[in-house]
């Protein structure tokens, strides 16, 4: 069992593990128990009633957080022709075709957070899938990162503005950043509400029993705060 420092234990002592907090109480407690010197990330962890061994029960969708995550998102776009210029005009940090693919392959260049591609580029991008895939950077229609040129500018703006991918891990748990400790409680609440709506909308038809089984909020390195399931699922934007 890992040893925790005095600051963590002091923060943990403020959390009553025998109760479930309303979203407002949980957010306030997460802010109160954050002890890092930097502006910590606030994360929501959702345990779902899905069987990740079945492909049709895995969650992979996106949500546009109304207040973003507080993180600067670096976007790389695989495009050519007019679409390449569209990407640059829309604020892509990097855009290119064969040259960019070669750079990633040759230099192991991964100085970006999200990769987007137009459909005509996917055949070429597939050649570096072995490098992008394990890092979660491979463009995919399910995550909204393979888009037609006409939708490219909007997609880039959404990603930079706070659109995040929701994807369960191999144990059926979602880990999603919903902002920073410096955000107001209202901003965090609205981001959490948007996340809950997206997760409910993405419920697989094959999921049996209770779908959302637990929700926990935490800050970077901080203790988890259990949230009341009924209250959090009734959050409205």
UniProtKB/Swiss-Prot annotation:
It comes from the Bacteria. GO terms for molecular function: rRNA binding; structural constituent of ribosome; tRNA binding. PROSITE patterns: RIBOSOMAL_L1. Keywords: Repressor, Ribonucleoprotein, Ribosomal protein, RNA-binding, rRNA-binding, Translation regulation, tRNA-binding. GO terms for biological process: regulation of translation; translation. Pfam families: Ribosomal_L1. HAMAP family: Ribosomal_uL1_B. Binds directly to 23S rRNA. The L1 stalk is quite mobile in the ribosome, and is involved in E site tRNA release. Protein L1 is also a translational repressor protein, it controls the translation of the L11 operon by binding to its mRNA. Part of the 50S ribosomal subunit. Belongs to the universal ribosomal protein uL1 family. This is Large ribosomal subunit protein uL1. It comes from Chloroflexus aggregans (strain MD-66 / DSM 9485).
